[in-house]
């Protein structure tokens, strides 16, 4: 049985691939970068499983159907779907181009939902399957310069929760992984804050997140928040902080 991991050429996606391979799953790893083939070669050296790699732009609406058709044509039976592909941005809404807005809406909402539709049908018919969706703590925080990013993650979070309830009695489990900050270089966080965040556990390494996420998924959990206590504290504090002060904190690059 195969696990599909999207956005698997680096960061959390690559670590998800390593964790799934260590659990004995064959892999289909997907990225919009050609380097995915090199990453597949590295994984083959480390794990005795079948590892396929595929270059696809998942930011277009036909991507989900194309990926499903590829699996059907090549007799790839998928038991695990990890929707990890995404983009991060730190800009005001009108600073983004029309093309970028279409990309982020497709990548964070349309493509994951349609991949779940196509592969979920097979999983439900088979009576077994797992889906992991990478959400974000920003789904619960409305702040400037993360307007589109946070809103798309809010859709994915709520969609994941709903479908988990719909499918869990049919042997298919959908897990919402909600991270805070991850040490992948995507975030515009000042170096001293990154160092402090890692020391305190507020910022986590991608391999740690991947292990926690997969463990929760295979247990059939609806959600795992990483790091849990810090996310809870942050959401509590954000609810208390005036909007003006929150804007200053964002401008300082604290989150």
What label would you give each PLM region?
Residues 92-94, 100-105:
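Substrate-binding pocket helix/loop in short-chain dehydrogenase/reductase
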Residues 136:
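Residue(s) in the substrate-gating loop at a strand-loop-helix junction
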Residues 84-89:
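Conserved NAD(P)H cofactor-binding loop of Rossmann-fold oxidoreductase domains
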Residues 166-229:
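SDR active-site lid
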Residues 23-39:
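Conserved glycine-rich Rossmann-like NAD(P)H-binding loop of the short-chain dehydrogenase/reductase
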Residues 116, 152:
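Active-site helix of classical SDR
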């Amino acid at each position: 049985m195969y696990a599909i991991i999207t956005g698997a050429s680096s960061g959390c996606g690559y670590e998800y691939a390593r964790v799934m391979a260590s659990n004995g799953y064959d892999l289909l790893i997907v990225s919009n970068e050609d380097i995915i083939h090199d990453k597949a070669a590295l994984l083959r050296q480390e794990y005795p499983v079948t590892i396929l790699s595929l270059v696809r732009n998942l930011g277009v609406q036909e991507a989900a159907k194309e990926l499903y058709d590829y699996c059907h044509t090549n007799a790839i039976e998928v038991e695990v779907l990890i929707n990890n592909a995404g983009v991060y941005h730190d800009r005001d809404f009108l600073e983004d181009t029309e093309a970028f807005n279409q990309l982020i809406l497709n990548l964070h909402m349309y493509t994951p939902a349609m991949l779940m539709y196509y592969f979920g049908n097979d999983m439900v018919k088979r009576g077994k399957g797992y889906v992991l969706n990478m959400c974000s703590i920003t789904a619960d925080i409305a702040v400037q310069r993360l307007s589109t990013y946070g809103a798309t993650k809010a859709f994915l979070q709520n969609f994941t929760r709903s479908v988990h309830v719909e499918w869990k009695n049919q042997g298919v489990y959908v897990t919402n992984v909600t991270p805070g900050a991850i040490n992948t270089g995507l975030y515009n966080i000042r170096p001293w804050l990154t160092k402090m965040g890692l020391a305190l556990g507020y910022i986590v390494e991608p391999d740690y997140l991947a292990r926690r996420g997969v463990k929760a998924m295979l247990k059939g959990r609806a959600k795992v928040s990483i790091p849990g206590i810090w996310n809870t504290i942050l959401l509590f504090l954000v609810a208390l902080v005036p909007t003006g002060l929150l804007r200053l904190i964002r401008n300082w690059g604290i989150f």
